[in-house]
């Protein structure tokens, strides 16, 4: 099997990139792509850049040219769930846009035209991530992750997310675009993010301070889940 992994920022992919064996590197449309093996698993790791457009472009490149069997989105996120702390893991059950508004045409807030309201992560992948997180003794929450082209640091933007998506556990800037592309390619996906801040007025300071911690945590989860993923995938195919 082949696993696709996508992260927005250099800090979010560096730890995994450093461990790829027989690594081949190329650049396409501003995306850095690294292919090789993590342990015995064939992987393609892509750094897309920040935001929904960059994420959608990178995901399309990854799925079209490398054709991974599944896709994992890694990186950092801002926590919305009250019990989440820096370094805790959030796992997507579903992903939605928080900044899309075509409600004038009868769609839900956050629903892109001609798309479902939410994009649902693969249940088997969620189970594998939960097993891995438990083995690593990390605190994790699974639930709705919201995405939009804004860094959330309190005020009206945060209030709007809490109003329309009261069950959201985290917010970030790429996952929904990645999920939409996976939906259109019919590729199973899961989002694994570690908390770097809590979306308040000081979130930009927290993000800068704790980004590397969040990146390390999410990368560790992915690295440890790959053997379980390979074994499980082989057993069901």
Curated annotation (Swiss-Prot):
Substrate binds at residues 78, 152, 173-174. Gene3D superfamilies: Nucleoside phosphorylase domain. Transmembrane segments: none annotated. One of its GO terms (cellular component) is cytosol. The active site is at residues 12, 197. Pathway: Amino-acid biosynthesis; L-methionine biosynthesis via salvage pathway; S-methyl-5-thio-alpha-D-ribose 1-phosphate from S-methyl-5'-thioadenosine (hydrolase route): step 1/2. It catalyses: S-adenosyl-L-homocysteine + H2O = S-(5-deoxy-D-ribos-5-yl)-L-homocysteine + adenine; S-methyl-5'-thioadenosine + H2O = 5-(methylsulfanyl)-D-ribose + adenine; 5'-deoxyadenosine + H2O = 5-deoxy-D-ribose + adenine. The keyword Lyase does not apply. Keywords: Amino-acid biosynthesis, Hydrolase, Methionine biosynthesis. It comes from the Bacteria. Its EC number is 3.2.2.9. One of its GO terms (biological process) is L-methionine salvage from methylthioadenosine. Homodimer. PANTHER family: 5'-METHYLTHIOADENOSINE/S-ADENOSYLHOMOCYSTEINE NUCLEOSIDASE (PTHR46832), 5'-METHYLTHIOADENOSINE_S-ADENOSYLHOMOCYSTEINE NUCLEOSIDASE (PTHR46832:SF1). Belongs to the PNP/UDP phosphorylase family. MtnN subfamily. Catalyzes the irreversible cleavage of the glycosidic bond in both 5'-methylthioadenosine (MTA) and S-adenosylhomocysteine (SAH/AdoHcy) to adenine and the corresponding thioribose, 5'-methylthioribose and S-ribosylhomocysteine, respectively. Also cleaves 5'-deoxyadenosine, a toxic by-product of radical S-adenosylmethionine (SAM) enzymes, into 5-deoxyribose and adenine. Thus, is required for in vivo function of the radical SAM enzymes biotin synthase and lipoic acid synthase, that are inhibited by 5'-deoxyadenosine accumulation. This is 5'-methylthioadenosine/S-adenosylhomocysteine nucleosidase. It comes from Hamiltonella defensa subsp. Acyrthosiphon pisum (strain 5AT). The lineage of its organism: Bacteria, Pseudomonadati, Pseudomonadota, Gammaproteobacteria, Enterobacterales. The gene is mtnN.
């Amino acid at each position: 099997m082949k696993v696709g992994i996508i992260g927005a920022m250099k800090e979010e992919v560096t730890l995994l990139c450093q461990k790829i064996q027989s690594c081949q590197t190329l650049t396409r449309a501003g995306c850095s792509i690294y292919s090789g093996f993590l342990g015995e698993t064939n992987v393609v790791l892509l750094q897309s850049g920040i935001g929904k457009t960059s994420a959608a472009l990178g995901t399309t490149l990854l799925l079209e040219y490398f054709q991974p069997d599944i896709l994992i989105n890694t990186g950092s996120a801002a926590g919305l769930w009250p019990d989440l702390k820096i370094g805790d893991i959030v796992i997507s059950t579903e992903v939605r846009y928080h900044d899309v508004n075509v409600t004038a045409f009868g769609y839900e807030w956050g629903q892109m035209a001609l798309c479902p309201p939410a994009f649902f992560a693969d249940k088997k992948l969620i189970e594998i991530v939960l097993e891995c997180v438990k083995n690593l003794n990390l605190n994790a929450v699974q639930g709705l992750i919201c995405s939009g082209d804004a860094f959330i640091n309190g005020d009206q933007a945060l209030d709007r997310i809490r109003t329309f998506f009261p069950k959201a556990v985290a917010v970030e800037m790429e996952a929904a675009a990645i999920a939409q592309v996976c939906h259109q390619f019919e590729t199973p996906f899961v989002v694994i993010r570690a908390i770097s801040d809590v979306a308040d007025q000081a979130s930009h300071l927290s993000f800068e301070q704790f980004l590397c911690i969040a990146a390390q945590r999410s990368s560790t989860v992915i690295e440890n889940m790959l053997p379980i993923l390979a074994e499980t995938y082989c057993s069901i195919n």
